[in-house]
Amino acid sequence: MTDSNLDKTLVLIPARMASTRLPGKPLADICGLPMIVQVAKRAREAAIGRIVVAVDHDDTYAAVANAGFDVVMTGMDHQSGSDRIHEALRAVDPDGRAEIIVNVQGDLPTIDPETIRASLRPLENPAVDIATLTVEIKDEEEKTLPSVVKVVGSAISESRLRALYFTRATAPYGKGPLYHHIGLYTYRRAALERFVSLGPSPLEKRESLEQLRALEAGMRIDVEIVDTIPLGVDTAADLEKARRILSGASR
């Protein structure tokens, strides 16, 4: 990636302290570092642009700043991570230099930097508004779990889909692969601005999936198929698993 592209790409990592299942989640210790710092390190290893962490608590702000990463304070009342990163974007880039905004969830401490880089590829097509990621489901149980969001899409190539729908149901019906959505989004700046200006859509509210707001508004989402799915830390058990993974990686 050229220096020019690095200047035009901004990685924003939202961190919310008020997790119901794992209170104080961004500061949970993983191998001697707060989880949010581990995520920021993975983003730095991806080397795609400036990294800013968007926080809502003084303790998180201090932890991120002490680790040497850029950080911005945001409000506590955001309904989604997209709303939080939009506030952060306006604060850290008011002049509009950044053209591509990468939203890396703050609870993915084991994410492969190459997975982050992969999210940029669909935006090489100027017709695409938003890019995201998916992995083929191999576990039969996952195919019916509502917690595993499925991508329904038309194949553009062996490694990419054009999203038609996202659902917690088992879809599409019939023989063929099913795809597990990875909640990392890369936006064109104008697409993010438009997205947050729209109110929650009917299907978004029904499925509790904010990306449906974009599809209902006629925005194009392309989905890059990757090989591995990062561990999302939502529970104490997830946290222990993340510690084991990163402990093994550091040896």
Curated annotation (Swiss-Prot):
Keywords: Cytoplasm, Lipopolysaccharide biosynthesis, Nucleotidyltransferase, Transferase. GO terms for biological process: CMP-keto-3-deoxy-D-manno-octulosonic acid biosynthetic process; lipopolysaccharide biosynthetic process. It catalyses: 3-deoxy-alpha-D-manno-oct-2-ulosonate + CTP = CMP-3-deoxy-beta-D-manno-octulosonate + diphosphate. Its EC number is 2.7.7.38. It is an enzyme of class 2 (transferase). It is found in: Cytoplasm. The keyword DNA-binding does not apply. Its main location: cytoplasm. InterPro entries: Cytidylyl_trans, KdsB, Nucleotide-diphossugar_trans. Pathway: Nucleotide-sugar biosynthesis; CMP-3-deoxy-D-manno-octulosonate biosynthesis; CMP-3-deoxy-D-manno-octulosonate from 3-deoxy-D-manno-octulosonate and CTP: step 1/1; Bacterial outer membrane biogenesis; lipopolysaccharide biosynthesis. GO terms for molecular function: 3-deoxy-manno-octulosonate cytidylyltransferase activity. Gene3D superfamilies: Spore Coat Polysaccharide Biosynthesis Protein SpsA, Chain A (3.90.550.10). Activates KDO (a required 8-carbon sugar) for incorporation into bacterial lipopolysaccharide in Gram-negative bacteria. Belongs to the KdsB family. NCBIfam families: kdsB, PRK05450.1-1, PRK05450.1-5. This is 3-deoxy-manno-octulosonate cytidylyltransferase.
